[in-house]
């Protein structure tokens, strides 16, 4: 699983209310949430981000209240992956559950500037700053998490597993 795109870089302690303000929590429609992603932080974010781009942030990204709306908004606006120095644990789980790839790597965050072209290999745990010709090592995604990402999130992964189990049960006669 390799992702490549332009970096959009922000700072520490970006909370879920900054990612998707509470005034938009009356919907769970990804397209609607995407329109308002990070708007209180960067009014032009949704106009600047292109499909496949990578969000880069400091420590404690996704802190604050637990809302799946935050990673849904990020994924729906076209971001392919988030690299941060650290993630709030509940955001980390929510991101995995909805199929948004996330990577913790302090060195990469320090070595990437806004606008840099970045490539992330989740399987190998390699982050490349193609603009500056630098490479950083992160912890590779475990295989079970890669499978969740490939399926598009935990719900789709479980549906696929249940279908396999049902198929196996039907064919074991």
Curated annotation (Swiss-Prot):
Enzyme class: lyase
InterPro entries named among the record's database cross-references: Aconitase/3IPM_dehydase_swvl, AconitaseA/IPMdHydase_ssu_swvl, IPMI_Swivel, LeuD, LeuD/DmdB_bac, LeuD_type2/HacB/DmdB
UniProt GO BP: L-leucine biosynthetic process
One GO MF term: 3-isopropylmalate dehydratase activity
Family classification: Belongs to the LeuD family. LeuD type 2 subfamily.
Subunit (UniProt): Heterodimer of LeuC and LeuD.
Enzyme Commission no: 4.2.1.33
Catalytic activity: (2R,3S)-3-isopropylmalate = (2S)-2-isopropylmalate
Top-level taxon: Bacteria
Free-text function comment from the UniProt entry: Catalyzes the isomerization between 2-isopropylmalate and 3-isopropylmalate, via the formation of 2-isopropylmaleate.
NCBIfam families, alphabetized: leud, LEUD_arch
Protein's organism: Caldicellulosiruptor saccharolyticus (strain ATCC 43494 / DSM 8903 / Tp8T 6331)
Keywords, sorted A to Z: Amino-acid biosynthesis, Branched-chain amino acid biosynthesis, Leucine biosynthesis, Lyase
UniProt cross-references to Pfam families, sorted A to Z: Aconitase_C
Protein name, UniProt field: 3-isopropylmalate dehydratase small subunit
């Amino acid at each position: 699983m390799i992702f490549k795109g332009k970096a959009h870089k922000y700072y520490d302690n970006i909370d879920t209310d900054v990612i998707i303000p509470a005034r938009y929590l009356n919907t769970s429609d990804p397209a609607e949430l995407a329109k308002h992603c990070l708007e209180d932080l960067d009014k032009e974010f949704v106009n600047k981000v292109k499909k496949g781009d990578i969000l880069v942030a400091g420590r404690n990204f996704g802190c604050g209240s637990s809302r799946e709306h935050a990673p849904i908004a990020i994924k729906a606006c076209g971001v392919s992956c988030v690299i941060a120095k650290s993630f709030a644990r509940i955001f980390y789980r929510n991101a995995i559950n909805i199929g948004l790839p996330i990577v913790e790597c302090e060195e990469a965050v320090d070595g990437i500037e806004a606008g840099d072209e970045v490539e992330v290999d989740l399987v190998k745990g390699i982050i490349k700053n193609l603009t500056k010709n630098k490479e950083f090592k992160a912890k590779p995604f475990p295989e079970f998490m890669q499978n969740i990402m490939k399926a598009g999130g935990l719900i789709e992964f479980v549906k696929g597993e249940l279908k396999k189990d049902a198929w196996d049960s039907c064919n074991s006669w």
